[in-house]
Structures are given as structure tokens and as C-alpha cells.
Amino acid sequence: MKSHQFSTALCQNTTQSNGQPLRFPSPAKLNLFLYINGKLPNGYHELQTLFQFLDFGDWLDISIREQDNQIVLTPEIPNLKTENNLIYRAAKLLQEKANIQLGANIHLDKILPMGGGVGGGSSNAATALVSLNYLWQANLSIDELAKLGLTLGADVPIFVYGQAAFAEGVGEKITYCEPAEKWFVILKPDDSISTAVIFQDPNLPRNTPKKSLEQLLSEPYKNDCEKVVINHYSNVEKALNWLLQYAPARLTGTGACVFAEFDHEAEAQAVFRQKPEAFFGFVAKGLNVSPLHAMLKQLSSTHTHRQSKPEVL
């Protein structure tokens, strides 16, 4: 059975036989807190939010196509044309930017829920950019990759840089940080959230005072979107209320996923075993360094080690 928890699989994933794909992690993220500080004249909202990665997510199996420059993406996603898929668009952007003549076979092993607020699509796009930059030896800097990623989505650069981060403004001001790496039970209620509906709601708080990162990290975390979301979506409210029986719990982003935090894995697993069948969910540890970057560091170390081995006579 394939593992969607990266820590158990990465150590076995740094060798590639000729023509065989490499598996690259595409992790989920949580917004550990989210505060709305104001609304700008252009309609955008000023935010303060804290991103952290999870040791859980999708995999992208990628191999180089030397015979042509085609991007072959599988499987097909219902009601989504391949050319509109963020993974495909990321690959084509990198090809054009770096003038790459090679192609790629990309298989998405999908587990993260669509529309859950855990960054699945943005993470997939970032993993495509970062991994193909490595495989194609495109040699773009991390800043160049992040700029490409920003054209695909506001959250893509966070996944490209691969470090837990505090974001301010409309998301353009980034400070890297190291919040506690706790264990989480994440539930995905059967609701599809409209972010536009949430941000247009007149009851959405829009005047939370700005605070320093140090102060925010020392206070209980909250999400300003939570009350509005549960007013619109009853299944989110049910999932959140269930988690609150056991531990502090919040919405991530605008949902639909909700999460509860624990200090130890055993506590999280014990609660998860009692999960109602109606909710998709998983247990994962928070990570301040993306598993994708951990893998690339491992790959680079392995490559350097092999190059430095003395020749056997």
C-alpha cells in the first residue's frame, strides 16, 4: 500500500533506475491562525496568517521524456482539461522560462481533498516546479521559481520556498518562523466552500488589530473566517463541534477542513479512531520544513556522495 505520510517513505525514495519515475511529495498545509485586518480600496483584504506544512499529502511520480518535450499528465481529472491543470501549467511555464527541450511523464497520486483549504492544488503546482527544475537541471533560483508560482496562485510561493511562514498584507510580506510542530487530526466535511461568499459576507470581521508575530505566537490561535463559515455550512459546524470535544480546534483558511491539535501522536490517533464515518480525515504532524525540500536535500547529498566516492581499481 502506498504511503501518503512522507516521513515513512522518503528514506527509500532517493534512487532512480533508468527511466523509472521519482516520487516527489506534495504536502498539505494548515493556516494555524488567520486574522483579517482590513479591506483595501481594490477589494483585497489585509491578512495576518501562519502557514505550516504537514507530513501528509499527495505524491507526484515524475520521469523525464527525452524523446520529445511533451508533458503527459495522468490520471485525467473529471471536468478539468489537462491544459488547465495547475501541474501541467507549472511544467509548461518552467519549460518556456528555462528553454527546456525535454518533456515529462507526471502521475498524480491524489489523496488530499479538493476544496479543503489544505493547499492541494497549490502544493501540486509547486512540487511540479521544484522537482522539474531539479530533474531537467533548469537551474532556476528558488526566487525565480516562486515568481513563476505566483502566476499560478497566491499560495504557490509558500510551497515553493518550503518553510513555515507568517504572511501579512495581501500575502506578499513573508517572515519565516518555527511554530511548535504539533500533531493534528484533520477532518474534511462534505461541504464545498465558496471563498467569495465568505469574504463578501457583511458579518465577516475586517478590523482585527495587527499584532507582532511574537505576540501572535504567544496567544491562542484563532481564525476570523470561522464563525461566518459555520453559519453558511452546517457540516463544517458539525465537524468542528465534534473535534472541540477533545482538543482546541479551528478552521484552516476558509475551509472546509477543520483541525484539532495535540502534543503527542498517540493522543491524536486515539481521537481519530473515534471519527464519525461521515468525515474524511487523517492524522499528521506539523512540519516547519516542507517534505519536498527535505527530499531534495537528501537527493543532493546522495548525488554528491556518489560523485566523491573513490574509484575502485
Curated annotation (Swiss-Prot):
Ubl conjugation keyword on record: no
Pathway field: Isoprenoid biosynthesis; isopentenyl diphosphate biosynthesis via DXP pathway; isopentenyl diphosphate from 1-deoxy-D-xylulose 5-phosphate: step 3/6
One GO BP annotation of this record: isopentenyl diphosphate biosynthetic process, methylerythritol 4-phosphate pathway
EC assignment: 2.7.1.148
Residues the record lists as binding ATP: P113, M114, G115, G116, G117, V118, G119, G120, G121, S122, S123
Disulphides: none
Gene Ontology molecular function: 4-(cytidine 5'-diphospho)-2-C-methyl-D-erythritol kinase activity; ATP binding
Keywords from the UniProt entry: ATP-binding, Isoprene biosynthesis, Kinase, Nucleotide-binding, Transferase
Active-site feature positions: K29, D155
Catalysed reactions, semicolon-separated: 4-CDP-2-C-methyl-D-erythritol + ATP = 4-CDP-2-C-methyl-D-erythritol 2-phosphate + ADP + H(+)
Keyword Cell membrane: no
InterPro entries: GHMP_kinase_C_dom (IPR013750), GHMP_kinase_C_sf (IPR036554), GHMP_kinase_N_dom (IPR006204), IspE (IPR004424), Ribosomal_Su5_D2-typ_SF (IPR020568), Ribsml_uS5_D2-typ_fold_subgr (IPR014721)
HAMAP family named among the record's database cross-references: IspE
Entries under NCBIfam families matching the protein: ispE
Similarity comment text for this entry: Belongs to the GHMP kinase family. IspE subfamily.
Function: Catalyzes the phosphorylation of the position 2 hydroxy group of 4-diphosphocytidyl-2C-methyl-D-erythritol.
Record's protein name: 4-diphosphocytidyl-2-C-methyl-D-erythritol kinase
Lineage: Bacteria, Pseudomonadati, Pseudomonadota, Gammaproteobacteria, Pasteurellales
